């Protein structure tokens, strides 16, 4: 009440007294306040007052670290001099002075220097780990985006080459058709397959065009290097010659068999129940050369390999006659006069035509010297392949091409490449055989080629039968 009354008195004076200006009034009131508070005007320093308030705020916000380290150094010096405390005692008292409304307060903190260092070290390590983890994550995301973009462009881009290759390659396998169905609809797959196919000539082979020639009694004029490779026999081996195929990304083997009467059909020991490995067939039959032949029925994808597609004829008798594969072609066999015959006929019709050994597959690649018309990649993609052919001079050709070895750049071949290789070496009649993991070539009991299955594993599988060259 007293303060309120004094203010009222002061304001009442404003009306009682007369002032020349406002400054005179303010000056008088300042003098009155100074007198009442007994503080000389000259002693009031507002800058110091503001600084004092700022210092209080700082002291409230954090402890005085300078005083902490100074007191710590002094204490350590005293400990070394007096030698009264253990060196293991790393705890020191941290004294900080806090001011609150002009009052001084002192608080003591216990700090462990080693523990603080350890915490800081662990924090730095965690930060580094997080940064490294973040870098790895960013790198993975970037790589994923790049690969995804490339794959998307290949799968759905304007150039259909990769799409056609993937669909035709996958759809001609037994176990990996899902690779095409993952990315494309049935409609797209059908459209691609319709644009990639093999159109056979429709002719049956004219065996009269094949005439055996004994080159040992004839002067030879080589037409090209391929003919020279065929006709130049290995020293001491008049039965066959192994020729390496190494052109671009193509790797494989061609065998020239000089005596076609030695070419025969051999079946797995338990054909009808389970297949047999090619090496086993070759050794069991004492064959100098062996190559896979028929495809096989495999509804459960268990690679049993025991039931061949179509007809199988051995020594002039039908030993198997199951459903045909939807691969074109037809009967592939040798007549009793040792000529390769290709024709769309039944097993009985083949027997009537004098066929001694045969199997069934396709497509036919060359008939009577005329290559089949191949649209696109032929609808078979690229993979390991096997084929059989015969030249006009009677020499038989076994061709086995490796594939799926992408690490070494060996993709395999399609129908186009297979036909070209056979044509270069003079095939007059030729047909595709079962391929993929089944493709195999055994020379003198040893697997010569490098088969790879659809999963990239280096292995072959059991098959129902094989073309062999007896010793």
Language-model segments: residues:
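N-terminal targeting leaders characterized by basic, low-complexity, disordered sequences
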Residues: 1-122
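Short glycine-rich loop/turn motifs
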Residues: 249-254, 328-329, 382-387, 464
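Structural signal for glycine-centered tight turns and loop->strand junctions in beta-sheet-rich domains
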Residues: 261, 338-340, 394, 437
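Short, solvent-exposed aromatic-acidic interface loops
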Residues: 269-274, 347-350, 401-406
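Active-site-adjacent helix-turn-beta-strand microarchitecture at beta-sheet edges
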Residues: 296-378
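Conserved, well-ordered active-site substructure
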Residues: 303-323, 372-429, 433, 438-471
